[in-house]
Regions:
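Beta-strand/loop nucleic-acid-binding surfaces
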Residues: 101
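Active-site flanking residues adjacent to catalytic metal/cofactor-binding acidic residues
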Residues: 2, 97-98, 119, 152
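Binuclear metal-ion centers of metallo-dependent hydrolases, dominated by the metallo-beta-lactamase
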Residues: 104-183
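Binuclear metal-dependent hydrolase catalytic cores
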Residues: 1-97, 106, 163-183
Length: 183
């Protein structure tokens, strides 16, 4: 989990069907601050004697690179969202960054020459205090030189999908529901 804002964690409770289908707790990887907030917002998922139908989560606090499914190394990327530090993630040669407004130079080193760069882009113009806008993203793309970039966490202020796609560089695309990326 990148951070504790509602649009990033409130849906955890809706994952109950997956938890019940798998008959085991759902692992959640996050930093200590986010773990504390998840326990605060979903206390019923962590009590010893849960009521029938309550979800069950296992919190794994991230402190450096960790491994998913015993095969995928995940490197956390420290990013800034307005005035709070949140996480992005790098999986092999793909990075996922959402809700970023700044990336420190030391963290940019982890993001250079990726196969796939997934980054938030709220709108085309009018700077925002907590999210990148298109000119900032395109500047990052030039600096980091990923082979492909997908824009996420976009608003209606960016424009219509087909129109925006024609305005973007060849290696930058809008993400969309159902998009599958191989890396």
């Amino acid at each position: 989990v990148t951070h504790e804002h509602n649009d990033h964690i409130i849906g955890l409770d809706d994952l109950r069907p997956l938890i019940f289908k798998n008959k085991e707790s759902m692992p959640i990887y996050c930093n200590a601050r986010v773990a504390k907030e998840i326990k605060h917002r979903f206390p019923y998922a962590f009590i010893e004697h849960k009521y029938p139908g309550a979800p069950s989560f296992d919190l794994f606090k991230i402190d450096g690179t960790f491994r998913l499914f015993n095969e995928i190394d995940v490197t956390p990327i420290d990013i800034i969202h307005s005035e709070i530090n949140i996480l992005g993630f790098k999986f092999k040669n793909l990075a996922y960054i959402t809700d970023a407004s700044k990336i420190e130079e030391s963290e940019k080193e982890k993001l250079k020459n990726l196969e796939v760069f997934i980054i938030n882009c709220l709108r085309k113009t009018e700077p925002h205090h907590s999210h990148f806008i298109l000119p900032q993203v395109l500047e990052l793309v030039q600096e980091l030189k990923p082979k492909k970039t997908y824009l996420i966490h976009i608003s209606h202020h960016l424009g219509f999908h087909d129109e925006v796609e024609t305005e973007l560089p060849d290696n930058v695309h809008l993400a969309y529901d159902g998009l599958e990326i191989e890396f």
